[in-house]
């Protein structure tokens, strides 16, 4: 007679941004440590957890559809994440959901799992959970979340109402996690938060400790410390505070990647004021010029919103003029979409959908031309590329100018003598508006 006990199985659906992905990784790590098995199929699972996004209406819809699918396919569902902060909205559509928690409610999620699917008896030494925890990214790169929440009150955003005000992680904890990731083979660390440049503001940049040494809780100190790990370090979601200037020399010295993801959102001072964003375009252009003088290899990524309430053709033209002058490398553009609970919903002069669409097309056409010209400048040069995947046709990787999922790729046709995570030198032979093609040197 077998004495093998049933190992409870959990299904998991993770939606939304990299910050949500990190939350999912933490929950999955705890579940695996406790002896739960994580399975990819609804019908194999004793229960399903759905980690939701609620940032914009399309994300809410996607989350509600994912919850519905999990209920139809499995029946036992726990919901967490940003949309979980709006329990009534979920219950109205899906009253049969077992439990709902808000974002970063790890302990509550685990308690609910224990209630419906009791913890197994298991030997923790047999769980085989890697020291760096369960990761949902490829082994060679990982997201490092340094804080939760945001102190800004941008009128298009409801993140603070879902994730709260800024709470910085202790710098010693952040650096210890980074060290574990590198020890496990990670070659690229992507620093994320709602507002990376505000790291430490909530604790008045107090001094923490790592390996017995004092370290200031600030973005610049964090970058200095991460540079000692000998891997690529990439900064995301950097609000344009003045002290961002202090990380540019670190990029010029090769300590962190010369890559800055800095969401500017618009270029019209009037629209920026309505958004409650910093609004001096001339000052921002001067900073970009100065950054490039200090670090000529700097890649600038940004995101913008067109069709924000009150945006006139004159405002939009200011945005196009800014693009022409700034010549940013990587740009994302969103058509403004009302989000339940956002202050911008109450603003007058909502822009018609057909006008949003027309402006978005003009924006993208201009930026694609700029991007193509910027990438064409790299043809004939040698660059470093981190390999993401390899098949019989060759390898696909990313340059220092390319973050995973959101930027371009470098195609190495016919190159099969590499593996994911390898960093190789490549001569660029061709380019379009997003991607590069080249051969290994």
Curated annotation (Swiss-Prot):
Catalysed reactions listed for this entry: L-aspartate(89)-[ribosomal protein uS12]-hydrogen + (sulfur carrier)-SH + AH2 + 2 S-adenosyl-L-methionine = 3-methylsulfanyl-L-aspartate(89)-[ribosomal protein uS12]-hydrogen + (sulfur carrier)-H + 5'-deoxyadenosine + L-methionine + A + S-adenosyl-L-homocysteine + 2 H(+)
Entries under Pfam families matching the protein: Radical_SAM, TRAM_2, UPF0004
Xref: SUPFAM superfamilies: Radical SAM enzymes
Subcellular location: Cytoplasm
Protein name, as recorded: Ribosomal protein uS12 methylthiotransferase RimO
Binding site residues for [4Fe-4S] cluster 1: 17, 53, 82
Residues that bind [4Fe-4S] cluster 2: 150, 154, 157
Cofactor note: Binds 2 [4Fe-4S] clusters. One cluster is coordinated with 3 cysteines and an exchangeable S-adenosyl-L-methionine.
Annotated InterPro entries: Elp3/MiaA/NifB-like_rSAM, Methylthiotransferase, Methylthiotransferase_CS, Methylthiotransferase_N, Methylthiotransferase_N_sf, NA-bd_OB-fold, Ribosomal_uS12_MeSTrfase_RimO, rSAM
Residues covered by the MTTase N-terminal domain: 8-118
GO cellular component: cytosol
Annotated source species: Salmonella heidelberg (strain SL476)
Keyword Metal-binding: yes
The family this protein is said to belong to: Belongs to the methylthiotransferase family. RimO subfamily.
NCBIfam families cross-referenced by the UniProt entry: 30S ribosomal protein S12 methylthiotransferase RimO, MiaB/RimO family radical SAM methylthiotransferase
EC number annotated for this UniProt entry: 2.8.4.4
């Amino acid at each position: 007679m077998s004495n093998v006990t049933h190992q409870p199985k959990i299904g998991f659906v993770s939606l939304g941004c990299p910050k949500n992905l990190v939350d999912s990784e933490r929950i999955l790590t705890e579940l695996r440590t406790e002896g739960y098995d994580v399975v990819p199929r609804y019908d194999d699972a004793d229960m399903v957890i759905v980690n939701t996004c609620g940032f914009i209406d399309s994300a809410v819809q996607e989350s509600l559809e994912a919850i519905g699918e999990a209920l139809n396919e499995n029946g036992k569902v726990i919901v967490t994440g940003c949309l979980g902060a709006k329990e009534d909205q979920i219950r109205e559509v899906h009253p049969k959901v077992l439990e709902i928690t808000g974002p970063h409610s790890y302990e509550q999620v685990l308690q609910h799992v224990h209630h419906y699917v009791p913890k197994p008896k298991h030997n923790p030494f047999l769980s085989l959970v890697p020291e760096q925890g369960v990761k949902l990214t490829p082994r060679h790169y990982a997201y490092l979340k340094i804080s939760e929440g945001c102190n800004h009150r941008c009128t298009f955003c409801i993140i603070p109402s879902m994730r709260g005000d800024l709470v910085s992680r202790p710098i010693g904890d952040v650096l210890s996690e980074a060290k574990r990731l590198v020890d496990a083979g990670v070659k690229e660390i992507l620093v994320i938060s709602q507002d990376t440049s505000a790291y430490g503001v909530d604790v008045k940049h107090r001094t923490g400790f790592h390996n017995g040494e004092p370290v200031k809780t600030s973005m610049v100190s964090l970058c200095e410390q991460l540079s000692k790990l000998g891997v690529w370090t990439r900064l995301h979601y950097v609000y344009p505070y003045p002290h961002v200037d202090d990380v540019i020399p670190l990029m010029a010295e090769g300590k962190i990647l010369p890559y800055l993801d800095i969401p500017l959102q618009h270029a019209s001072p009037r629209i920026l004021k309505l958004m409650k964003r910093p609004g001096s375009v001339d000052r921002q252009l001067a900073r970009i010029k100065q950054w490039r003088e200090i670090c000529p290899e700097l890649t600038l990524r940004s995101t913008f919103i067109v069709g924000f309430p009150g945006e006139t053709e004159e405002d939009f033209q200011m945005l196009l003029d800014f693009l022409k002058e700034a010549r940013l490398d990587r740009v994302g553009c969103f058509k403004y979409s009302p989000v339940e609970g956002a202050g911008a919903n109450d603003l007058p002069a909502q822009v018609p959908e057909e006008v949003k669409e027309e402006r978005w097309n003009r924006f993208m056409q201009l930026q694609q031309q700029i991007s193509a010209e910027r990438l064409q400048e790299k043809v004939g040069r040698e660059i470093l590329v981190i390999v993401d995947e390899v098949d019989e046709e060759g390898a696909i990787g990313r340059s220092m100018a390319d973050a995973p999922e959101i930027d371009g790729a470098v195609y190495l046709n016919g190159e099969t003598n590499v593996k994911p995570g390898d960093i190789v030198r490549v001569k660029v032979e061709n380019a379009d508006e997003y991607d590069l093609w080249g051969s290994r040197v």
